[in-house]
């Protein structure tokens, strides 16, 4: 395949295509999904780590930074492509030096490894894993040693390690279900809002958002159109202000 014959050119071509609609904006920050699907039941081979290093080199040459998310399953219709906890732990260990070596081009690490798209939606993780164990490994192996910040789907997950402040203080949020600061019933979609079941998450982020980078994206665009759940501009501004967003994608999946 072309990507294996000349990975550097393949990566550069893909970045060019991906960034073409935004070329006049001189993009310096992007969100990247790195799928390890082919290795979900075995170690990462040397060649995979080498290709990832080439990718980081290309970013460095282009003076870009990324929000980096490792994942296995790229569809909630293919949950069987997820990885088990033992292999997740092994891959995190294998990626430790790579992440540390390239921390200068990583804005944040995001969620990752668990669930469809690495989003940490619990209903989409197969086989089941211990979320606390995975979170601790990510923070202990990838985030803290590299001096990076980490972003999780919900403050609820952040609270898993609220008894260890050095790690807790490195965690922000990547909201995969942004609807603005509104009170409509049933709009959570496994996110959190100002008056929903996870109201405490909303209030917690309002208190803590100033101290870590926050990121978000609109909910699935097709779904928004079908359900007529269109985000109000003023409500969007209010949420971004109160939760102090550092970055945001107006198109779900960062397209």
Feature names for model-found ranges:
Residues 1-27, 94, 100-101:
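Non-catalytic accessory regions flanking glycosidase/transglycosidase catalytic cores in CAZymes
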Residues 6, 88-93, 149, 153:
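Lectin-type carbohydrate-recognition ectodomains
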Residues 7, 11-15, 31, 35-36, ...:
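Extended hydrophobic/Leu-rich segments
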Residues 16-21, 28-73, 148:
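Aromatic-lined substrate-binding rim segments of carbohydrate-active enzymes
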Residues 34-36, 70-74, 99, 113-115, ...:
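Short, flexible loop/turn elements at secondary-structure junctions
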Residues 35-47, 76-86, 115, 119-128:
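The substrate-binding groove and active-site-proximal loops of carbohydrate-active enzymes
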Residues 47-65, 82-108, 130-142:
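An active-site-proximal structural segment forming one wall of the substrate-binding cleft
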Residues 105-255:
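Catalytic-core regions of glycoside hydrolase
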């Amino acid at each position: 395949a072309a990507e294996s014959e000349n990975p550097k050119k393949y990566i550069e071509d893909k970045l060019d295509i991906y960034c073409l609609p935004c070329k006049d904006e001189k993009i310096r920050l992007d969100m990247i999904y790195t799928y390890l699907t082919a290795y979900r039941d075995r170690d990462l081979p040397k060649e995979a780590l080498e290709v990832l290093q080439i990718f980081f080199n290309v970013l460095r040459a282009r003076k870009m930074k990324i929000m980096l998310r490792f994942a296995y399953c790229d569809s909630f219709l293919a949950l069987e492509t997820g990885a088990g906890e033992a292999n997740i732990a092994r891959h995190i260990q294998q990626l430790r030096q790579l992440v540390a070596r390239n921390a200068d081009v990583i804005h944040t690490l995001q969620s990752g490894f668990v669930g469809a798209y690495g989003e940490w939606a619990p209903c989409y993780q197969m086989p089941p894993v211990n979320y606390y164990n995975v979170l601790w490994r990510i923070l202990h192996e990838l985030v803290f040693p590299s001096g990076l910040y980490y972003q999780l789907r919900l403050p609820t997950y952040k609270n898993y390690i609220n008894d260890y402040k050095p790690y807790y203080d490195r965690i922000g949020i990547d909201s995969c279900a942004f609807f603005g600061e509104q009170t409509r019933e049933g709009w959570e979609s496994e996110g959190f809002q100002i008056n929903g079941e996870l109201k405490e998450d909303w209030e917690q982020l309002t208190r803590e958002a100033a101290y870590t980078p926050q990121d978000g994206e609109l909910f699935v665009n097709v779904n928004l159109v079908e359900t007529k759940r269109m985000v109000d501009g003023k409500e969007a501004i209010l949420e971004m202000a109160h939760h102090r967003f550092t970055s945001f994608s107006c198109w779900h999946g960062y397209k």
